C-alpha cells in the first residue's frame, strides 16, 4: 500500500463512542444493553484511542437519534447487494455491506485486532439523514475503529480483507490457487496506508464499474476528520448489526434498535441545517487538505452556497493547500482526471460546469503562485474542459455554431486541385459535404 497516498476525510473533534441503546422488547437490558459492540475506550485526545467521553449519555449537540424513515434508508443501504467487478476473467462478487462488515470484524477478532465500533461515513451517511440533499452518494464508506499499533497490524488488516473476498466468490470457483496478490489485482481499486505521528489509518477500496466502490477504512487515529459540515456525519452501525444477528422479527416503526448519528463537525443540528439548506461551512479551513478545493467546487456545482462572506478567505486557504499537496502540473492533472472519473459517474453533463467553476475559483483566489505557474494550472483546467466538450460533442449555450476560415485566394483557381483537408474529430456534425470557397476549421 502506498505510504501517505490519498486523503480520507472525517472531523478533528473528538469522536464519541456512545453505548448501544436498545429499545424495549427482546433488546431491553440483559446481555445486550450497552453491549460488546458499542461503548468502551474509544475517543479522546483528537484520536481514536483513549478514554471515551460519551456525548449521548449527557446529551450534547454532537449526537442525534435516527428517526424511523432514516433507519429504513440505512437498512436499505446495508442490505443492498453491491457487485464488486473483477478485472479480466474474474467473476463478479455479490457483496452485502452488513455481511462484509460481519466477516471482516470476526476475522480481525481472531487475529487479536480489536474493532471498537463500525460507522457509516461520508455522503452515504448524509444521504441516510437527508435524502434530498443534492449530494447523492457513490462510494460506500465503512469505518472500522481499530487498534493499529504497528506495521504488523496494518499487514494483518490487508491480509484479512483479501482473505474475506474468497468467501464471496461464486460456487464452483477453485479457490486453492488464488493468492492474496491475485485478489488484490482483480478486485481492489486502490489501497492507501498512512502511518505517522498524527495519522494511523488504512483504506481498501473494492471496485465497482458504476463508481459505487465499497471502501473499508481502518482508523486508529486521524488529525483532520472532515472537510465541510455537510460531510461530517457518521452513523454508528453496531446496534443495527446486532439486531440483524439476534432478532427473529423484522424491524417496524415501533420495534427497531436505537441508532445514533453524530456530526464530528460539532453541532449536529447546525450541520443538519446546513445539509438541508445547502450551506457550505467548516471549521479551521487552514487544516483542510488539497482535495478540499475540489470538494468545495463540487458543492458549488450542486447548488450549495457559502454560509458567509468570509468564503474568500476559505477559498484562498484551499487553493494554497491544493498547490502545496499537488505542486507539479503532472500531479495536478492526475488528481483532476481521477476526481472527474470518480465523482461524476452518470453526471458527465456536469463536468464542464464543474471545471469552469474550479477555473473561476483558482483564477480569483490563488495568491501563492508565480504568474506562469498560475497560468499553467488555468490552462490545464481549460484543456480538460475542452476535452469534456469534445467527448460530449457540444458547445455550451450556443446552438448550431460552425466556425469557418477563408483559404488563400489561389484555392479559388479552377486549376488548383491539390488542397489537403486534415481529418479531425469535429465538435459539431457538419451537413455540407463540399465547399467551393469557404472551408470549415473544425
From Swiss-Prot:
Signal peptide positions are none
Q: What is the effect of changing residue 127 to R?
A: In OI18; uncertain significance
EC number(s) per UniProt? 2.7.7.19
Report the catalytic activity. Answer: RNA(n) + ATP = RNA(n)-3'-adenine ribonucleotide + diphosphate
Which Gene Ontology cellular component terms are annotated?
A: cytoplasm
Q: What is the effect of changing residue 139 to N?
A: Does not elongate poly(A) tail
Q: What class of enzyme is it?
A: transferase
Keyword annotations for this protein, in alphabetical order, are: Cytoplasm, Disease variant, Nucleotidyltransferase, Osteogenesis imperfecta, Repeat, Transferase
Query: Where is this chain's protein located in or outside the cell?
Result: Cytoplasm
**Superkingdom of the organism of origin:** Eukaryota
Q: Which GO terms describe its molecular function?
A: poly(A) RNA polymerase activity; RNA binding
Q: In which tissues is it expressed?
A: Widely expressed, with preferential expression observed in the retina compared to other ocular tissues. Also expressed in osteoblasts.
Each sequence repeat, start to end: 24-28, 29-33, 34-38, 39-43
Q: Which InterPro entries match?
A: TET5 (IPR012937)
Q: Which GO terms describe its biological process?
A: mRNA stabilization; positive regulation of bone mineralization; positive regulation of osteoblast differentiation; regulation of ossification; response to bacterium
Q: Which disease is it linked to?
A: Osteogenesis imperfecta 18: An autosomal recessive form of osteogenesis imperfecta, a disorder of bone formation characterized by low bone mass, bone fragility and susceptibility to fractures after minimal trauma. Disease severity ranges from very mild forms without fractures to intrauterine fractures and perinatal lethality. Extraskeletal manifestations, which affect a variable number of patients, are dentinogenesis imperfecta, hearing loss, and blue sclerae.
UniProt record similarity statement: Belongs to the TENT family.
Q: What does this protein do?
A: Cytoplasmic non-canonical poly(A) RNA polymerase that catalyzes the transfer of one adenosine molecule from an ATP to an mRNA poly(A) tail bearing a 3'-OH terminal group and participates in the cytoplasmic polyadenylation. Polyadenylates mRNA encoding extracellular matrix constituents and other genes crucial for bone mineralization and during osteoblast mineralization, mainly focuses on ER-targeted mRNAs.
Task: Write down what this protein is called.
Answer: Terminal nucleotidyltransferase 5A
Species name for this entry?
Answer: Homo sapiens (Human)
Q: Which gene encodes it?
A: TENT5A
